[in-house]
Design a protein with these regions (language model features):
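Acidic donor-binding/catalytic loop of UDP-sugar-dependent glycosyltransferases
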Residues: 60, 87-90, 130-142
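Glycine-rich, basic loop-to-helix element that forms the pyrophosphate-binding segment
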Residues: 105-122
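Short aromatic/hydrophobic "clamp" motif used to bind/position activated sugar donors
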Residues: 127
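N-terminal membrane-anchoring/stem segments of glycan-assembly enzymes
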Residues: 1-40
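Short, well-formed alpha-helical segments that are part of the catalytic scaffolds
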Residues: 23-33, 55-68
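Cell-envelope/extracellular polymer assembly enzymes that use nucleotide-activated donors
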Residues: 44-47, 77
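Short, conserved active-site loop motifs that form the nucleotide-linked donor/cofactor pocket
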Residues: 76, 99-101
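A conserved acidic beta->alpha catalytic loop
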Residues: 65, 72, 81-90, 107, ...
Length: 142
């Protein structure tokens, strides 16, 4: 008799966890939907730091990707750290009017050293690191 009660209690706990509780939450969501407000007043300042080395083939797509991100422009600093010797710096410089900042270095010291040199200029409360060939979904920063 004890084992039958224990088995029934175990089945009830599992059923509650995987069936009853999710059904109640879904029903509550239908009955009392939450009003969704997009409030950017508490959105932190964010720096998107893109490191680039001879990325002229992909840098323009990366910059377009950065500008298309769903994050308030006044709260987003896009900073490109480049040690490039190809046309990457010239492409990035064309985006200066759109708020993209370029820090170009002529001596190659490697990715870690370049990031370390640029970090003091990052104004964000949060810093997101990215390679030039990594494309983000539009909502990746939220």
């Amino acid at each position: 008799m004890f084992f039958e009660i224990l088995l029934a209690a175990s089945i009830a706990v599992v059923a509650d966890t995987y069936a009853v509780y999710p059904a109640l939450v879904a029903a509550l969501g239908v009955v009392r939907p939450r009003e969704w407000r997009k409030d950017d007043s508490h959105t932190p300042q964010l720096t998107l730091l893109v490191s680039a080395y001879n990325e002229q083939d992909v840098i323009e797509a990366k910059l377009q990707n950065c500008l298309a991100l769903d994050y308030p422009r006044e709260r987003l600093q896009i900073l490109v750290a480049s040690e490039s010797t190809d046309g990457t710096n010239e492409i990035v410089a064309r985006y200066a009017a759109r708020g993209i900042e370029l820090q170009a270095f002529h001596v190659r010291r490697g990715k870690s050293a370049t990031i370390a040199r640029v970090l003091p200029d990052a104004r964000g409360d949060i810093i997101v690191f990215s390679d030039a060939n990594a494309m983000y979904r539009w909502d990746a920063l939220r």
